[in-house]
Swiss-Prot record:
Record: residues binding Mg(2+): D45, D84, E114
Full protein name: 3-methyl-2-oxobutanoate hydroxymethyltransferase
Organism: Shewanella loihica (strain ATCC BAA-1088 / PV-4)
Keyword Ligase: no
Compartments it resides in: Cytoplasm
Top-rank taxon: Bacteria
Chain sites annotated for binding 3-methyl-2-oxobutanoate: D45, S46, D84, K112
InterPro entries named in the record: Pantoate_hydroxy_MeTrfase, Pyrv/PenolPyrv_kinase-like_dom, Pyrv_kinase-like_dom_sf
Length: 264
């Protein structure tokens, strides 16, 4: 199978073909996900919670992401690999350039940053210098204390319009991909239709171009709180590779996410 690139994802969007993404943190799981056909793998700062046992993603360092990006890169042949830029690793464009360079040198194809209008200069500078950017709007976990917890965003008219405006501005600044997390399905649909770049949803309804989940949720091995938008595919298949194939098939056919996985 041909390698997935940002151009591949753009073609998928233009053709109306849904694509799938998962988090991955090591070579073995990444290799399995890659060989079964997952299009995008994310070395997420979610590792702070699912691997390191923290209550949020804030303690994760650039060095943590670099280490796990190298691990995942060794295990894959086809998937597009995105690396999260952790909390306060891109507070200025200069800091972002230094840290994004380290992640690209570790094997990432793209870096992901959380935030809206304040990120525009950073997004432009990174893309102008050859570092592709995936933006992240809606519930941005690095801002959990600003939000007062992990809460659905964009439910009122003002916040919904802000997210729409930020999505358009980030695309104009040069971002090649956008993640929308925990926003009403109708809002995510509007943004997806308004943008040229592909949009990946997590808790954002079925009308985004792609879907992403945390691998621990897909395999039913998360401890503590289980997000409403997640689905345990291992429980219905009994085998890891079968679970991944079921996830891909349900996204492709529109079965997932269903109404119970979305917000209004």
């Amino acid at each position: 199978m041909s390698k997935i690139t940002s151009s591949t994802l753009l073609k998928f969007k233009q053709e109306g073909k849904k694509f799938t993404a998962l988090t991955a943190y090591d070579a073995s799981f990444a290799g399995a996900f890659d060989s079964e056909g997952i299009d995008v793998l994310l070395v997420g700062d979610s590792l702070g919670m699912v691997l390191q046992g923290h209550d949020d993603t804030l303690p994760v360092t650039v060095e943590d992401i670099v280490y796990h990006t190298r691990c995942v890169r060794r295990g894959i042949k086809r998937s597009l690999l995105i690396a999260d830029m952790p909390f306060m690793s891109y507070a200025t464009p200069e800091q972002a350039m230094t840290n994004a360079t380290a992640l690209m040198q570790a094997g990432a194809n793209m870096v992901k940053l959380e935030g809206g209008h304040w990120l525009l200069e950073t997004v432009t500078k990174l893309t102008e210098r050859g570092i592709p950017v995936c933006a992240h709007l809606g519930l941005t976990p690095q801002s959990v204390h600003v939000f007062g917890g992990f809460k659905v965003q964009g439910r009122d008219a003002d916040n919904a319009q802000r997210i729409i405006d930020e999505a358009k501005a980030i695309e104009a600044a040069g971002a090649q991909l956008l993640v929308l997390e925990c926003i009403p399905a109708a809002l995510a649909k509007s943004i997806t239709e308004a943008l040229t770049i592909p949009v990946i949803g997590i808790g954002a309804g079925a009308d985004t171009d792609g879907q992403i989940l945390v691998m621990h949720d897909v395999l039913g091995i998360s401890s503590g709180y289980i997000p409403r938008f997640s689905k345990n595919y291992l429980a219905q298949t009994g085998e890891i590779r079968s679970a991944i194939r079921a996830y891909i098939e349900e996204v492709d056919t529109g079965v997932f996410p269903a109404a119970e996985h979305t917000f209004s």
